[in-house]
Amino acid sequence: MAPRRFSAVVLSLAALAVAAPVLALDYRTLAEAAPVYEAPSAKSKPLFVVLAGTPVEQVVSLEGWSKVRDNRGDLVWVEKKFLAEKRNVIVRAERAQVRAAAEDKAALVFEAERDVVLELLEAAPGGWVKVRHRDGQSGFLKAPQAWGL
């Protein structure tokens, strides 16, 4: 009986490993300022307006609507027409250092405070991401210091 139980465990773990890519997070950015609602209908209660450029995680997608999570964990509904494929991230650290290269000792390009929105340019090796500030400066940020990846 023990070999069968072991086989079942191995098969279960293998199934999880295969399914893991399906669980990838789907991040979007608001293309323009948009009202968000408590239900997928413009007739439902509007909660607040989210600023253009804000990254969100798309959790559920229905016809014309998406349920999204913001960087604080709030779940709201937004019309799909406001979502763009462009990727932005929000700084999670109190003060994040953006460097000229993807290494701790590289020259400091700029610092960004918590909740600053940065454009995501590309992933970099070693747990870094290349980002650009709205003023045009770009550099590398440690991935754990950003939300929206």
Roles of regions detected by a PLM:
Residues 1-10:
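Bacterial N-terminal signal peptides that target proteins for export
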Residues 21-39, 46-52, 57-117, 121-137, ...:
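SH3-family beta-barrel domains
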